């Protein structure tokens, strides 16, 4: 009897210990070893001489960035998923930001404050997420990843990033409601380093690797996914130089037999040329070709987003040309971004096969197009 009680007690003790261990390692519990409190000391950061200062500021150890476009890079960190929290007092007249999943200045994810909007919680572009791809910050190609936020200069602001696979939530001063919800991180990397830039102070940096607070790692829903009106497939030429001031005419149309490559649109119907061709050091252009098979003659309306300049030819005749260059006064709404709101034009289609040739030029940040017809009924997009 005593032996039976002993065995039962032993098994019960093992079971309780096992349950306790499972509880300690559950996803909702953060092991102490997983929380990285990053010291604001020079030995933990890589930076250019005299560009960063480490000090006590408002009673907390802080890092002060003294020079714009001179990131302070955290040493010995390979971050993929998890939570990043920090306090920031922005002083930059332009932007204060954090890079993550950073493998170089040319490839990383970037979240930033437009500090000119500090104190204006209704500014539509107060904060933005944008990746840097092939050396190009895609702020002008992804306007749906910006939004309002309540933050201020001359005081601490608390920022929390929750990053899980393809998704990210950004909290600013209010930890109950995200200021930005990013359904798909658009950068090329799944892991990398972390850095800060922009004049101002950084303090209380805490990183919790793999603590994602239940955020799904899967890509979120594309609001245009079920909309058949977008022209999501085209053929693409290679880029060629286009001297400043030169406009495209019918004499510039590509010749029969020129090499073409198939290109599929990204989320929201964006034909993103930056991801393929990278930065334009000087003005250059690419041709996009779309073939439409039409049952009967009809006129359609095209909602058209573009960056920077476009020339649209229908069946070898110039139909539409426009510019969306960020500098005023020729930038398009919304504020020079590539958006379906940029422009629209009539598209007179003949019965049979119609060929659209779209010249796209670029010499400033991102480039690409978005095209959506008012209806695709009676129209077939040919491969």
Located regions from the model:
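Short carbohydrate-recognition loop motifs
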Residues: 53-70, 82
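Secretory/extracellular carbohydrate-interaction modules
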Residues: 69-134
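Short, aromatic/His-centered strand-loop micro-motif at the edge of beta-sheets
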Residues: 135-158
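Carbohydrate-binding surfaces in secreted/extracellular proteins
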Residues: 152-181, 309-319
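Short, solvent-exposed beta-strand-to-loop segments that form ligand-recognition rims
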Residues: 173-191, 319-331
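Ligand-recognition surfaces built from glycine- and aromatic
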Residues: 186-224, 338-348, 355, 369-372, ...
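Extracellular/secretory pathway-exposed regions associated with glycan biology
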Residues: 208-295, 364-383
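Aromatic-lined ligand-binding clefts that engage carbohydrates, nucleic acids, or primary amines
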Residues: 299-313, 356
